[in-house]
């Protein structure tokens, strides 16, 4: 599956006539948008968004991280974000939307599918922001020499087929690896939503 790291905010906290958060810079701007932030408990995504919030173009992020002082620059930006009231460090996908709904944080990074489920499936007061999203992916692997090799290969072949990958979009808003799967997602669908008729394609 393909998914992205992005962030969401609680619309009950930032509502009305607010100039609403729309960039990764806004996520780091606590003077403009107050409240505790939720961030992942590891380095993944944090270093990248910190540099982009500090003015580094997305195309240059990994070159900067690979340069002298690049990691230190990113860590300094993260320290600035978390220095006053600290940050909520999450490790599981359900934690960011739960913390947002409970108003334990005003904004949090998250995986897009988890925010989508909370917004569309549960009607949670959350808005997802796509600016500076980081595309990520997960693989399926087969252990060499394990039991039931033939059956495992058949299962793997189906899971990674155009049809199998398209079918996953019925359950979570993560994109298929195969371009050929997109043409199979013909109808608006989302099985977890209240009306079951959500167009998954923009998500």
What are these regions (language model features)?
Residues 1-99:
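Extracytoplasmic ligand-binding site segments that recognize negatively charged/polar headgroups
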Residues 71-81, 121-144, 190-191:
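Periplasmic-binding protein-like
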Residues 108-125:
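A ligand-binding cleft/hinge motif common to bilobed small-molecule-binding domains
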Residues 134, 138, 143-203:
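Mature extracytoplasmic/periplasmic domains
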Residues 33-37, 83-86, 103-106, 123-126, ...:
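Loop/turn elements at helix/coil->beta-strand transitions in domains of secreted/extracellular proteins
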Residues 5-7, 13-15, 43-47, 113-116, ...:
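Solvent-exposed loop/turn segments at secondary-structure junctions
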Residues 96-99, 115, 152, 165:
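Short, hydrophobic alpha-helical packing/hinge segments within bilobed ligand-binding/sensory domains
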Residues 41, 112, 172:
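Short secondary-structure boundary segments
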């Amino acid at each position: 599956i393909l998914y992205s790291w992005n962030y969401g905010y609680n619309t009950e906290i930032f509502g009305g006539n607010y100039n609403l958060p729309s960039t990764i810079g806004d996520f780091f701007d606590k003077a403009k948008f107050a409240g505790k932030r939720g961030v992942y408990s590891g380095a993944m995504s944090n270093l990248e968004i910190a540099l982009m919030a500090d003015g580094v173009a997305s195309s240059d992020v990994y070159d900067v991280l690979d340069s002298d002082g690049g990691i230190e620059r990113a860590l300094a930006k993260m320290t600035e974000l978390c220095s006053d009231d600290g940050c909520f460090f999450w490790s599981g996908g359900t934690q960011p939307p739960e913390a947002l709904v409970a108003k334990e944080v005003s904004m949090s990074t998250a995986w897009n599918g988890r925010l989508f489920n909370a917004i569309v499936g549960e009607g949670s007061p959350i808005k997802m922001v796509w600016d500076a999203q980081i595309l990520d992916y997960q693989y399926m692997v087969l252990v060499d020499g394990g039991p039931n090799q033939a059956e495992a290969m058949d299962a793997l072949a189906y899971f990674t087929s155009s049809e199998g990958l398209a079918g996953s979009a019925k359950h979570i808003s993560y994109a298929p690896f195969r371009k050929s799967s997109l043409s199979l997602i013909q109808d608006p669908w989302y099985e977890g939503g209240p009306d079951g008729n959500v167009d998954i394609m923009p998500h």
